[in-house]
């Protein structure tokens, strides 16, 4: 919430009046592109909604704050989890799903978010495999076969939405989590 608010506050004049602050006062945003770009602001809001660590500098700030406090051994208190409401909920949900014997697919739009989810799954001792757009050929097939082979005991499969739905059969999964749906309804409908 704090970081979302900071993005808004940084661009408040633009949102309210179509103006931006300059060193010499306030000037109207011109068509030439002065002022914040809406697409960039949207992307910053999307990142913030996924996890504050996706914003530049936030992870270092949160980790420094945590180092000052007495670090708890409880995973729910780890800054990677506690700084994101989605991660707090995901920890509770995945713990319950694992205890009940479910197998889970987790989709994300961003490979950087998959990186954070991968760190989270390791921290929580959840077994997983992953594919994204950078994983090709045999490595991709091996990850799919490993997940589908129940004897391997892989609980989660991380997938990027772009790499994930094409030519993949993951019949052993019974739960799908879309960590961050696309803000474009046409893309999300696919």
Regions found by a protein language model. Give the residues of each.
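Conserved Helicase C-terminal RecA-like lobe
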Residues: 1, 6-12, 20-156, 160-164
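Conserved RecA-like helicase motor core of SF1/SF2 enzymes
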Residues: 126, 134-137, 161-190
């Amino acid at each position: 919430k704090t970081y979302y608010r900071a993005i808004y506050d940084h661009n408040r004049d633009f949102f309210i009046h179509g103006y931006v602050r300059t060193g010499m006062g306030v000037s109207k945003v011109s068509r030439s592109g002065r002022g914040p770009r809406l697409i960039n602001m949207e992307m910053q809001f999307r990142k913030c909604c996924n996890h504050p660590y996706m914003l530049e500098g936030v992870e270092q700030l949160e980790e420094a704050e945590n180092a000052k406090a007495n670090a708890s051994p409880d995973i729910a208190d780890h800054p990677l989890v506690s700084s994101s409401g989605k991660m707090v909920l995901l920890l509770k949900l995945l713990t319950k799903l694992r205890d009940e014997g479910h197998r889970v697919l987790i989709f994300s739009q961003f490979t950087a978010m998959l990186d954070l989810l991968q760190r989270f799954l390791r921290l929580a001792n959840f077994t997983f495999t992953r594919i994204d757009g950078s994983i090709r050929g045999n490595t991709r097939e091996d990850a799919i076969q490993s997940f589908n082979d129940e004897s391997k005991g892989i609980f989660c499969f991380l997938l990027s939405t772009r790499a994930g739905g094409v030519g993949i059969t993951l019949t052993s999964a019974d739960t799908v989590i879309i960590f961050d749906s696309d803000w474009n309804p046409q893309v999300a409908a696919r």
